[in-house]
Amino acid sequence: MDYVGGSLKLKNVKKKPLKKKKKDSKKLAEKVQEHSSRDKSPLEENGVSTYQMLRSKDTDSAMPMTEAQKHFESVQEQRLLQKAKNERLKTHKDRIDEYNRLLESQSEHFDMPKIGPG
C-alpha cells in the first residue's frame, strides 16, 4: 500500500493558485499619516503622552497619595528606568551569554533522581 503525503486529492477538481493581494505602500503611508495627525490631542502635541494623561486622570479621581505611596512610585519608576538602561547597553552576545548561564544553572527534568519505588 502506497502512502502519499499531503492533502486529500479530489477527482475532477482543479486547484487554483492563490494570488496574494498587493498593497499600495503610498496609499498605506498616507492613511497612517492622516490617522496619526487626526488622533493627536492638544496635550500630546505639547509633549504629554497618552499614558501620562490616563495616569493623571486616575490619580485625580482617587484619594491623595501618602508619602509612602509617593516614595514607592518614585522608587518603582527609578528601577524601571535603570532596568531599561541596562537592557539597552547589552549587546546580543551579552544577552546570549546571560541566557546560557541561566540554562546551565537550571536542572533538566530527566536529570532529577527518581524518588520512591518505581
From Swiss-Prot:
InterPro entries from the xrefs?
A: FAM32A (IPR013865)
Which GO terms of the cellular component aspect does the record hold?
nucleolus; nucleus
Give the region (Disordered) as residue ranges. 1-49
**Bias kind Basic residues: ranges:** 11-25
One Pfam family recorded for the sequence: FAM32A
**What ranges does the record list as Basic and acidic residues composition bias?**
26-43
Concerning PANTHER family, the annotation shows: PROTEIN FAM32A
How is this protein named in the record?
Uncharacterized protein C31G5.21
